[in-house]
């Protein structure tokens, strides 16, 4: 007798840890120039994520170089992530232009899309928000920003706790610190302090917050119940692979020298 082994058409060329995966194509921010392709953040073995802007009905593809060979990955009509064979030109499209968070799982051959709306800095104190602009390639930011902190009964010198908010599929999520109640940073604090973690819905709005760096911002005199920074800053959120993790940075704006 004989038996037949049926195998699912899996992905043969799985990129290793040091073989980056990119999103590229006319539908992406690189306009089809693979040299400008956006690298995805590797979250785990076979799992990659990117925040990026896509154009409706324009093709894109996932790409990696595995053991020296250029490999492309697409999504078939059943929503299954597959590897393109030589000579094939399958691509992927989305029906609506927008900014998306895309997650692919090569082991399970799945893809998910989340639509991203407003992104902003949020101070629970005073319920103050500062909207951020999308800068491209998974970055959001604001330039020449004057930080503010408001006095509270428990914080006479101003409450510096803040986090970042992001609308994902119409629901607002907070991104905050890894620790529930982390102290204030200074100019020599390790950059890992600024790494961003998506918090569960319903998390206490004060917990897992960042705190302002007084050494950088140089607070002025109190005006009413608010202190304003005398040093303007450029604040950038990196929802990309640039630092190997989602993170953010505050730097003094060039305009301060005027």
Model-found features: residue ranges?
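Insoluble glucan recognition modules
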Residues: 1-258
């Amino acid at each position: 007798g004989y038996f037949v082994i049926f195998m699912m058409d899996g992905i043969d060329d799985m990129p290793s840890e040091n073989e980056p995966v990119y999103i590229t194509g006319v539908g992406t921010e690189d306009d089809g120039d693979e040299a400008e392709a956006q690298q995805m953040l590797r979250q785990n073995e076979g799992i990659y994520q990117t925040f990026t802007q896509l154009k409706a009905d324009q093709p894109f593809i996932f790409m990696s170089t595995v053991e020296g060979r250029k490999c492309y990955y697409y999504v078939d009509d059943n929503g299954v992530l597959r590897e393109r064979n030589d000579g094939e030109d399958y691509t992927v499209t989305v029906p609506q232009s927008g900014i998306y968070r895309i997650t692919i799982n090569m082991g399970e051959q799945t893809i998910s899309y989340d639509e991203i709306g407003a992104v902003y800095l949020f101070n629970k104190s005073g319920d103050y928000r500062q909207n951020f602009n999308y800068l491209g390639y998974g970055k959001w930011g604001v330039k020449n920003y004057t930080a503010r902190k408001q006095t509270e009964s428990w914080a006479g010198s101003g409450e510096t706790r803040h986090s970042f908010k992001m609308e994902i599929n119409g629901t607002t999520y907070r991104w905050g610190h890894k620790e529930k109640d982390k102290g204030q940073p200074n100019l020599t604090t390790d950059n890992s302090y600024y790494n961003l973690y998506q918090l569960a819905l319903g998390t206490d709005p004060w917990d897992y917050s960042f705190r302002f760096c007084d050494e950088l911002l140089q607070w002025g005199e109190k005006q009413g119940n608010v202190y304003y920074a005398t040093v303007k800053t450029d604040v950038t959120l990196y929802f990309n692979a640039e630092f190997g993790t989602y993170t953010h940075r505050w730097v003094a704006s060039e305009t301060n020298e005027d």
